A protein has these predicted regions:
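A short, conserved alpha-helix in the catalytic core of glycosyltransferases
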Residues: 167-183, 190-217
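Conserved donor NDP-sugar-binding/catalytic core segment of glycosyltransferases
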Residues: 98-141
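Short, flexible, basic/aromatic active-site loop/helix in glycosyltransferases
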Residues: 135-165
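A conserved acidic beta->alpha catalytic loop
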Residues: 23, 37-46, 93
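Glycine-rich, basic loop-to-helix element that forms the pyrophosphate-binding segment
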Residues: 64-81
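Short, well-formed alpha-helical segments that are part of the catalytic scaffolds
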Residues: 13-26
Length: 298
């Protein structure tokens, strides 16, 4: 029974979307794909409609007349879904053939409301082909080696032995649609929407959802010229400002839950200051080693 709608928000990345598009068309559990074009100027909507003509899965296109941002785009997609589950894709992420089926199976086995597999960076120096999708063997990790609550970050490429409860996961997640009756993506997050995913998963956990990370399947995040335009790209200085602003908002919003569920101590402001000082020290080291560059928000 097809029970999943895939939602793919995108902005001015039709080249990357075309590269990963075949990976979204091979999942028997998927009933429909919805592409949310968030005000693109590169002909994204028209091109996706062309791709839809040969897709084995029905494809809908939601077109925003202007760029509303990632949280609004996600919720636009959710409103179009009618299936029990939704899964968020991205315009520069390639799914393994078993990604949807494995997540659906393990969600049912664990009672998960939300679950995501591993995500591995795929370096694409020129044109994309599947030889770029490299996932070498690596040791199994414990959950406490994956999640770093001192930075609200995680190492989602790491392997774990099976589904593990997660305080937060990355965006390529399978989510029961009824979760959105209690929790929504917060449209306060703007710019590159840094932290909007973490915000959603913390809120979902606080509302009683069961959130899991699993090592049983994988997807690949393309990095290189193919994804060097569009998306949520911002320059480094602006990114660092957003890292401070958005992290402060996140921690103030979720501090009572984080203290109760994860034993964080002190104040949200104190945590944020310590985090940001460590972050800037790391940035100075990086700049000294490799120079100044722009970056992406994800």
């Amino acid at each position: 029974m097809t029970s999943i709608t895939i939602l793919i928000p995108t902005f001015n990345r039709i080249r990357a979307l075309e590269a990963v598009w075949p990976s979204y068309l091979v999942h028997p559990d998927v009933q429909r794909i919805v592409v949310i074009d968030d005000g693109s100027t590169d002909g994204t909507s028209d091109r996706v409609r062309e791709l839809a003509k040969t897709s084995p899965i029905p494809v809908d296109v939601v077109t925003h007349e202007k760029q509303w941002g990632q949280p609004e785009s996600r919720m636009s997609g959710v409103k179009k879904a009618t299936t029990e589950w939704v899964m968020f894709g991205e315009d520069d992420v390639w799914l393994a053939p078993d990604y949807c089926s494995t997540l659906l199976r393990e969600a049912k086995e664990t009672g998960a409301s939300i679950i995501a597999g591993r995500i591995v960076t795929a370096r694409v120096p020129g044109e994309f082909d599947e030889s770029c999708l490299v996932d070498p063997p690596s040791p199994l990790r414990n959950a406490n080696e994956v999640f770093d609550l001192d930075s609200m970050d995680a190492r989602f490429a790491e392997r774990v032995s099976g589904p593990v409860p997660a305080p937060y996961i990355h965006s390529i997640a399978l989510i029961r649609r009824d979760v959105f009756s209690k929790v929504k993506f917060d449209t306060w997050y703007s710019g590159n929407s840094w932290r909007e995913e973490t915000d959603f998963y913390l809120a979902a956990n606080a509302a009683g959802a069961k959130v899991y990370f699993t090592g049983s399947t994988v997807c690949f995040h393309l990095r290189g010229p193919i994804s060097a335009i569009g998306g949520q790209r911002v320059n480094r200085l602006w990114f660092e400002y957003l890292a401070w602003r958005n992290t402060r908002y996140l921690m103030n919003k979720h501090w009572p839950y984080l203290k109760r569920a994860h034993g964080l101590r002190g104040t949200a402001t104190g945590w944020t200051i310590r985090y940001y000082l460590r972050r800037q020290a790391d940035q100075i080291k990086r700049i000294a080693q490799s120079g100044f560059r722009s970056t992406y928000g994800s």
